[in-house]
Amino acid sequence: FNDDPAWLVLSTAAYLKETGDWTILDEAVPYENQPGTETPLLEHLQRCIQYTLDRIGPHGLPLIGRADWNDCLNLNTFSDQPGESFQTTTNRDGNVAESVVIAALFILAANELAQIMAHLGRVEDSDQLKGQAAEMTETIKRSAWDGEWFLRAYDHFGRAIGSQHNNEGQIFIESQGLCTMAGVGVKEGAAKKALKAVNRYLATDHGILLLQPAYSQYYLHLGEISSYPPGYKENASIFCHTNPWVMIAEAILGNGDQALDYYLRINPSQREAISDLHRCEPYVYAQTIAGLDAPSFGEAKNSWLTGTAAWNFVAITQWILGIRPDFEGLRVEPVLPSGWDGFTAARKFRGVTYQIDVRRIGRGSKIALTVDGQPIKGTLISSPSSDKVTVNVTIG
């Protein structure tokens, strides 16, 4: 699963942003839990980046391995034996099949590690990482743009997956959200096109589908994803874990209305109004909601078995409300839905309580902050003067 290294970098960056505890980078961590192999966590992060760079495929994209985040997209398994594990079986050398999702995660991880290195004063390392992220960005633009949306992968035969030229599985949610989060095509308008395609082809009243059209039969070269009935699990259900990536992507593009709309579509308490259909506890997310192709479209499946709650918390608090930790302080950058006049929030961050009051004063999107009555430049609060801070934010 060649996406794994990126998540260590991203989770460490999230820890650093929240706590400001840079000493964790010096912690000695073993490899594969083997005593005597310990090196500092920072070295592990560097190795994570190099792991991907050492595994690049024919189109310049990262090799997928057995799978990536979607552990049912098994492009090197080719299993024809009932009962055989898709996750542990490999019948191809793995030197061709590539993942656009891993490419996007690599960009995110490399840019985060670049900021970590800059904080540590390692400017040369930081610049190198930024260059590697920029190169992968160009690779996605060159090799993974399908005209209206981002491809999902290339298979063992070098054929595109998630392309308008496919009969089934023409568009996938993951690469649209993650590529936008990574900044790919944001300035050029490609990200905007990709999110429009999500809205047109994947969005439903019950959430955003993982892919469309659903796979109608088992495909040896695709693996477990095509073994499920259409509309269930990874085969075109509403896979809730991925929906917040699109919410975040919409917020990045300034689309607060669309971000909130998607948030509410899968929100458990919101769906209690249709509990006879949803059939899930009103206080918990499900892994999936049956998709358009399923007989039980809109019915929740596998409650609790998901990372959706954590990701939706990030989407609503850090990107729609816009209160998010950064390496050098707390950033307040709301993307308000048009129907909101503002909001108030209290945020405890690194021993300081921030009382935040956000008000819309016009139709524009210009953000201005005052901290304890004093205007500041930008949206980052880096040097609070006490353990209780009042933040006033105007938008318009």
Describe each region flagged by the PLM.
Residues F1, L16, L42, L53-R55, ...:
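A general structural signal for short secondary-structure junctions and capping/turn motifs
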Residues F1-D3, Q87-A103, R159-A182, V186, ...:
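Solvent-exposed loop and edge beta-strand segments that line ligand/cofactor-binding
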Residues F1-G65, S99-A103, I107, A236-A259, ...:
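Aromatic-rich carbohydrate-recognition surfaces in CAZymes
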Residues A6-W7, A14-V100, Q128-F157, K193-L222, ...:
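Active-site acid/base region of carbohydrate-active enzymes
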Residues E27, A182, G189-A190, I356-D357, ...:
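Short helix/loop capping segments that flank catalytic or ligand/cofactor-binding pockets
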Residues L63, V101, L108, W149-L151, ...:
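Structured core elements
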Residues L105-I225, L264, P268-F297, K348:
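Catalytic cores of carbohydrate-active enzymes
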Residues R200-A203, S216, P229-N235, I248-G396:
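Non-catalytic C-terminal accessory modules of carbohydrate-active enzymes
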